[in-house]
Amino acid sequence: MSGRHRKPTTSNVSVAKIAFTGAVLGGGGIAMAAQATAATDGEWDQVARCESGGNWSINTGNGYLGGLQFTQSTWAAHGGGEFAPSAQLASREQQIAVGERVLATQGRGAWPVCGRGLSNATPREVLPASAAMDAPLDAAAVNGEPAPLAPPPADPAPPVELAANDLPAPLGEPLPAAPADPAPPADLAPPAPADVAPPVELAVNDLPAPLGEPLPAAPADPAPPADLAPPAPADLAPPAPADLAPPAPADLAPPVELAVNDLPAPLGEPLPAAPAELAPPADLAPASADLAPPAPADLAPPAPAELAPPAPADLAPPAAVNEQTAPGDQPATAPGGPVGLATDLELPEPDPQPADAPPPGDVTEAPAETPQVSNIAYTKKLWQAIRAQDVCGNDALDSLAQPYVIG
């Protein structure tokens, strides 16, 4: 057999099968490789979350619009105008389609930070422009769905027609005049006039005073009737004689005169000074310096009756005020006694001492021929004794004011 018709060997058939199988597998691998490098929707969502927080309708006012942050010039240069005037007004799919075109022309450098995970660019089929315009302007997941529009209002009810009696009177038209009273028939008698009550006349006191006018003067006192008796003259009652009251009898007890020390001090005037001790009269010779002071009554020796001064005795208690005698009725004082003192106030004579009683040895006997002058202290003691007995009277005071001389 010639070589052209020779039956192919098994080795050649195996080579051909291997070549065919490799071609089939190689073509499928190439197709699978091209499919694996295309950018997916998840990759674009990752870019949108990185660029705008996943808000596909964002417009921050910085010149970058939409979820992939397109500029207006990039959006218009890559055919975005066929979907919407600007990127934030287009839908997510429309923005991804324009993003595929930008990725094909500029690569991942169009998004320097967020575009590192993108694969190769692949053309996308997008919705028509009319469907894109009907898409919501904002993402429902971020801003929520807008509230539905209110339903259109129902047809208004027809106006109610009021009846003629219910219609309000037109404004501006005068009311009709009241009908005039018909004239009475000529044959009827005129009505009797009604009794008109006379006007009530108020009294003068009941009338109100006119405003702005002075009040009327009070009416004068009416004249008394002629038949009344005239008033009694004022001089009918005789004045009481001045000498009707009899004078007080002269023998009435005079008012009690208080002593100088007992009288209350006058208001506003200084108190009287205490009476100083009276000096002895100038015509009397002073007592000798060697004379001893008078001894007490129980120690003094018997002295001559004409020289020894009477010892002060217990004074009688003063008489009552109604029992005192008037100054004119007082009895005369005893001779040699104080002037002005009553006899009942005279000092009693001292008891006689026995003649044989020897004088005490420590008492010096005054010579009989030398007159004794009473000490001023004796008068003072006498005055104190009188005051102790509540004796009052100007005559007694005057008598005490004069020194008493024994001799």
From Swiss-Prot:
Q: What drives induction of this protein's expression? A: Expressed in actively growing cells, activated by CRP.
Q: Which CDD domains match?
A: RPF
Pfam families associated with the record = Transglycosylas (PF06737)
Q: Which GO terms describe its cellular component?
A: extracellular region
Query: What EC designation does it have?
Result: 3.-.-.-
Instruction: Give the signal peptide range.
Output: 1-33
Cite the record's Pro residues compositional bias ranges: 148-159, 171-193, 211-249, 293-312, 350-361
Any idea what a deletion of this gene does?
Not essential, disruption of rpfA alone has no effect on growth or survival in liquid culture, nor in mouse infection models, although cells are clumpy after 2 weeks in stirred culture. Alterations in gene expression are seen. All 5 genes in this family can be deleted without affecting growth in culture, however triple deletion mutants (rpfA-rpfC-rpfB or rpfA-rpfC-rpfD) are not able to resuscitate spontaneously in the presence or absence of O(2), and are attenuated in a mouse infection model.
Low complexity compositional bias: what residue ranges? 160-170, 194-210, 274-292
How do people use this protein in biotech?
Answer: Might be a good vaccine candidate.
The entry assigns this protein to a family as follows: Belongs to the transglycosylase family. Rpf subfamily.
From the Swiss-Prot or TrEMBL record, give the protein name: Resuscitation-promoting factor RpfA
Write down the species.
Mycobacterium tuberculosis (strain ATCC 25618 / H37Rv)
Q: Which gene encodes it?
A: rpfA
